[in-house]
């Protein structure tokens, strides 16, 4: 029986006899063959569906490690800045270990589905003026001066936990893919995947993939080469204008012979709808930066026909239900409560 990440990959993680045995059964997420989109693009495309994690995003991988180590080291409280997914994950694992969780969010810039999770898990939530980068600056200063552990991706234990997704992909494919496509926000995850692939190459002899990272155009600090003071994109999970792991992300792309590129909101929304309507997979907008990037790079020839590609789908579509409604035409038929009229309407739908 699967026992969670800290047990599954203990030999690759900084755990010892003092590390709390904590898990919400994070990890072990499906690698879904995206058969219909594969046919359209001429590649072997898979989606690593991180929305299947306990709080609905990849953050659980790093958070179980970071919060467990915080508890091991005697901390009774954790703090983070968040656009949503980090807050949900931090609050869940803090609740599991009986710790206090303080979350600082940018006012009015967090999806309701994510905020609802943090509230349900009992976190203390503080809203401040500004954007995510302002919130991160604040919590870094507080954690440096107060007895509270910072659990944003600048915490190295987060990277240790998140690298396990690379292990899983290799285990599921029995090799690494040719290309890993991944959204880039604060840039911790791309860093973690590269670390994981490098470790598995040394341990098991698997090849390393080319890493293609994708920022949202309105928050593409790395691609544009400068901090974006007021980042704006429909993809709230990657609406970050000054990535904390900027240099590590660039290293991952360069060392893997990949690149970091950007995709527009229009490309993200196209991928978002395509994934749901042709594959039955519902991932939040930020997740679809990876798929949008795959489409862009196949069309430009940067991803070759026939290559094996894994697109990391970082979060569940239920995280941001407002976008699901606003980006699709909500056409609800109004029919009287008469069985024949209902049947006639259904026949019309089937025949259309």
Swiss-Prot record:
Any one of the GO BP annotations: threonine catabolic process
Sequence positions bearing N6-(pyridoxal phosphate)lysine: 59
EC main group: lyase
EC number: 4.2.3.1
Gene3D superfamilies tied to this protein: 3.40.50.1100
The reaction(s) this protein catalyses: O-phospho-L-homoserine + H2O = L-threonine + phosphate
Residues binding pyridoxal 5'-phosphate: 85, 185-189, 314
Gene Ontology molecular-function annotations: L-serine ammonia-lyase activity; pyridoxal phosphate binding; threonine deaminase activity; threonine synthase activity
CC cofactor: pyridoxal 5'-phosphate
Keyword annotations: Amino-acid biosynthesis, Lyase, Pyridoxal phosphate, Threonine biosynthesis
Pathway info: Amino-acid biosynthesis; L-threonine biosynthesis; L-threonine from L-aspartate: step 5/5
Job of this protein: Catalyzes the gamma-elimination of phosphate from L-phosphohomoserine and the beta-addition of water to produce L-threonine.
Family to which the UniProt record says this protein belongs: Belongs to the threonine synthase family.
Protein name: Threonine synthase
Species in which this protein is naturally found: Bacillus sp. (strain ULM1)
The encoding gene: thrC
């Amino acid at each position: 029986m699967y026992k969670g990440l800290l047990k599954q990959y203990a030999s690759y993680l900084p755990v010892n006899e003092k590390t709390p045995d904590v898990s919400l059964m994070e990890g072990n997420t499906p690698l879904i063959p995206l058969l219909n989109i594969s046919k359209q693009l001429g590649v072997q495309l898979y989606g690593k569906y991180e929305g299947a994690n306990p709080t609905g995003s990849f953050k659980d991988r790093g958070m179980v490690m970071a919060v467990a180590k915080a508890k091991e080291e005697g901390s009774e409280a954790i703090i983070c800045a968040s656009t949503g997914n980090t807050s949900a994950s931090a609050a869940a694992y803090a609740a599991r270990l009986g710790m206090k969780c303080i979350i600082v969010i940018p006012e009015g810039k967090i999806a309701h589905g994510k905020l609802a999770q943090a509230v349900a898990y009992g976190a203390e939530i503080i809203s401040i003026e500004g954007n995510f980068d302002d919130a991160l600056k604040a919590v870094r200063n507080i954690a440096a001066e107060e007895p509270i552990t910072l659990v944003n991706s600048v915490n190295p234990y987060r990277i240790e936990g998140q690298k396990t997704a690379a292990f899983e992909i290799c285990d599921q494919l029995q090799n690494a893919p040719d290309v890993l496509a991944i959204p880039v926000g604060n840039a911790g995850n791309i860093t973690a995947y590269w670390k994981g692939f490098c470790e598995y190459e040394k341990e098991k002899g698997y090849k390393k993939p080319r890493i293609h990272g994708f920022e949202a155009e309105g928050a593409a600090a790395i691609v544009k080469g400068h901090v974006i003071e007021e980042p704006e994109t429909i993809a709230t999970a990657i609406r970050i204008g000054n990535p904390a792991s900027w240099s590590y992300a660039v290293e991952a792309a360069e060392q893997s012979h990949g690149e970091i590129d950007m995709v527009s909101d229009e490309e993200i929304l196209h991928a978002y709808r395509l994934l749901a309507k042709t594959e039955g997979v519902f991932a939040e907008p930020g997740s679809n930066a990876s798929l949008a990037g795959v489409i862009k790079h196949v069309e430009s020839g940067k991803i070759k026909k026939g290559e094996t590609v894994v697109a990391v789908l970082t979060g569940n579509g239920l995280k941001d239900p407002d976008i699901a409604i606003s980006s699709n035409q909500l056409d609800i038929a109004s029919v009287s409560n008469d069985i024949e009229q209902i049947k006639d309407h259904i026949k019309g739908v089937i025949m259309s």
